[in-house]
Amino acid sequence: MPYDIAIIGAGPAGATLARLLDKRYKVLLLDKRDLMEPEEGERTKCCGGLLAPDAQEVLGRMGLAVPAGVLVDRQLFLVRTIDFDNHLERYYQRFYLNMDRKRFDEWMVSLIPPHVDMGMKCRFTALSERSEGYEIAFIHQNRIYTERVRVMVAADGAWSNVRRQVFPELEGIRRYITIQEWYETQEDIPYYGAIFDSTVTDFYSWIIAKDGRMIIGSALEPDREARSKFEKLKGELRDFGYFFGKRIKREGAYLLRPLSASGIITGNDHMALVGEAAGFISPSSAEGISYAIRSAIALADSLNQGIEGFQYRYRQNLKSLKRNIMLKRIKSTAMYNKTLRGLIMRSGILSTDIME
């Protein structure tokens, strides 16, 4: 018997959708990780692991409270903004939750009801269109399996295999590669760091303290100079007074940045895209969890009214989310223009004075 809905990717978007779909549907959820019985040292998503206020708000609206076991030491409420272009530094108050991203994903998966079939350690490979949906292929323990599905959902992130197989590259979205390194540190870092340097990236870089370690990361153009630019960033931070101990690990991933509404793809009559696979991510901060969850809620609402015509309803449900993305795009114009950013930082507006 074919599945009504197959979801590729069990991150916040896929897990939320699987949890909210009506139990009358036969649902399959696939992920290449094992988020139900994780193994020590298993690869994790390259993510700073900060839960922004927008994501906290949407979790609260769903009646969900983040378990203490998901949070890490320490919880910080200040952002140190370092602008190497303008030789400026300011502090701003922000209320992020500092968390373990892997444990967050595991918690979201644990909320999925038992009627959903979950295939962990399953790597989606291919699809073929049929008159009433798709036939999908995936690999589990070196064996190839196929299933027929009426609706396929791509929730597999920026480097979405589903999106790349079905939809062309669009000019309305820009692709980056994120490099993130974890270091041992003896430093007391009571803030998050946001670093701007246009010689490194036209986006931004970051510093995060997490469980006694220091994370240094950057969103870079995916070219041959990415590694050297990342090393340049680390050199600047050393000169600025940061000390890195032994490197623990290095991570990398792709990141999307929507430049216009045309870069967002919602799918077709037998397919839907959610979260970053669709292009839902903040173009100013790269925050994606709130958009992943909100797009999944919009899709669940449209599918729970029936499969027929779901794509039209999904697009209608997404209008406010698309407007939000475009407002963030306008905000990013000021943030990433070094002249405008310099004027704003020099004015001290919304900044916080640190007590000595």
Which residues fall in each region the model found?
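N-terminal Rossmann-fold NAD(P) dinucleotide-binding loop
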Residues: 14-15
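FAD/FMN-dependent oxidoreductases across multiple families
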Residues: 126, 224-299, 308
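Conserved FAD-binding catalytic core of PHBH/FMO-like flavoproteins
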Residues: 145, 151, 159-234
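Glycine-rich Rossmann-fold phosphate-binding loop(s) that bind the pyrophosphate
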Residues: 9-11
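Glycine-rich FAD pyrophosphate-binding loop
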Residues: 6, 20-45
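C-terminal helical "tail/cap" subdomain of flavin- and related membrane-associated enzymes
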Residues: 301-356
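Conserved N-terminal helical subregion
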Residues: 57-61, 65-165, 172-176
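Extreme N-terminal starter segment of soluble prokaryotic enzymes
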Residues: 1-5
